[in-house]
């Protein structure tokens, strides 16, 4: 296995010069940089990350804590965040808590013990003092503490978009499905706005709360069956994409026409709405913009800077306003300016 001494010998420079190159310290000519990199490539040299971290006080590892990697929203966000971290030279440690408070605590202890550079938290398992962890933290769609920045989609706008769709369709009796959560999440804003808009326009609106830790598609199908048995007169459903898909599938199996008899509108804009038939209209969350904002804020905190705002809110769009060629790439062709709040 090649050592730093071997690299220095092949490159014709000192060990100290190679060390400065690896740790990006001090001025160095492009010719010297090129010679060192050529030697590294030739020898397949791998720097000792432990020794390097002792010198730089950095590990270039970032932890991402999420409640369920199978859920389309979190799966998509994890992918986008990993891409963004990789582009900036970080490696991501994915921590899937499976909605377990005990696992969440264990993962946080592990990340802290391994001195990761920072943590991105999107888990909704337990309400603990994240401010006391002592590492740079950015929150994904969850209110953790006043001194921890949170990045989320504009759920108020999302609630309005969904409400307008139901009013336009002429629905008279609608139900929105709400996920159970022990902690405060900005995503709850969409449900509040949606219910207010429905009632302001004389539309009956009921809220159906999903059971704690109900996240499997099979359980959503069972819920859809029970729900349609209990509320046969409902003509509109508002839910996260995966839940909406389950309700739509069960309704179709009963001979309900979609959207004529039952108007189903989703929320998330993950791949789910594209595989649904009939097509599932939905509110598309800006995954790439959120990922870029989260990583940018985390880098600032790692550098010792204090972000200007506590909340960073990014606009959403309706799938019905997105051209087919942009479908599945929610923000690629849109100017979605980050709006601090």
Please identify what each model-predicted range represents:
Residues 1-59, 333, 337-341:
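N-terminal helix-turn-helix DNA-binding module of bacterial transcription factors
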Residues 2, 60-164, 227-229, 233:
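Alpha-helical recognition/docking segments in bacterial nutrient-uptake
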Residues 17-20, 54-69, 173-180:
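Short beta-strand segments enriched in small/hydrophobic residues
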Residues 67-76, 94-103, 151-161, 177-225, ...:
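Hinge/beta->alpha junction and helix N-cap segments in small-molecule ligand-binding domains
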Residues 108, 116-122, 175-178, 231-242, ...:
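Periplasmic-binding protein-like
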Residues 173, 205-207, 258-263:
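Short acidic capping loops at alpha-helix termini that bridge into adjacent secondary structure
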Residues 225-226, 230-238, 242-341:
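Flexible loop/turn connectors
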């Amino acid at each position: 296995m090649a050592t730093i001494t071997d690299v220095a010998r092949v490159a014709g420079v000192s060990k100290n010069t190679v060390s400065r190159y690896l740790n990006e310290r001090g001025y160095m000519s492009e010719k010297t940089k090129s010679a060192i990199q050529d030697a590294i490539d030739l020898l397949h040299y791998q720097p000792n990350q432990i020794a390097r971290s002792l010198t730089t006080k950095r590990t270039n590892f970032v932890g991402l804590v999420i409640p369920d990697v199978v859920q389309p929203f979190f799966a998509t966000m994890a992918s986008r965040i990993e891409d963004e971290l990789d582009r900036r030279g970080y490696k991501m440690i994915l921590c899937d808590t499976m909605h377990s408070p005990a696992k969440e605590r264990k993962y946080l202890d592990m990340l802290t013990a391994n001195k990761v550079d920072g943590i991105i938290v999107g888990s909704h398992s337990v309400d603990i003092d994240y401010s006391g962890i002592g590492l740079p933290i950015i929150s994904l769609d969850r209110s953790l503490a006043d001194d921890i920045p949170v990045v989320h989609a504009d759920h108020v706008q999302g609630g309005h978009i969904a409400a307008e769709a139901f009013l336009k369709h002429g629905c008279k009796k609608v139900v929105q499905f709400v996920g159970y959560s022990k902690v405060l999440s900005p995503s709850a804003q969409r449900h509040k706005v949606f219910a207010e808009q429905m009632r302001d326009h004389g539309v009956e609106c009921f809220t159906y709360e999903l059971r704690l830790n109900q996240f499997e598609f099979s359980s959503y199908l069972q819920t859809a069956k029970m729900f349609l048995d209990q509320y046969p007169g409902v003509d509109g459903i508002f839910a996260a994409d995966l839940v909406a898909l389950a309700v739509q599938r069960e309704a179709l199996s009963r001979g309900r026409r979609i959207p004529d008899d039952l108007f189903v509108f989703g929320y998330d804009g993950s791949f789910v709405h594209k595989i649904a038939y009939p097509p599932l209209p939905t509110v598309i969350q800006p995954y790439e913009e959120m990922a870029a904002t989260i990583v940018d804020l985390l880098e600032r905190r790692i550098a010792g800077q204090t972000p200007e705002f506590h909340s960073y809110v990014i606009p959403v769009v309706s799938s019905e306003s997105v051209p087919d060629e942009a479908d599945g790439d929610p923000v690629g062709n849109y100017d979605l300016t980050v709006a601090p709040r």
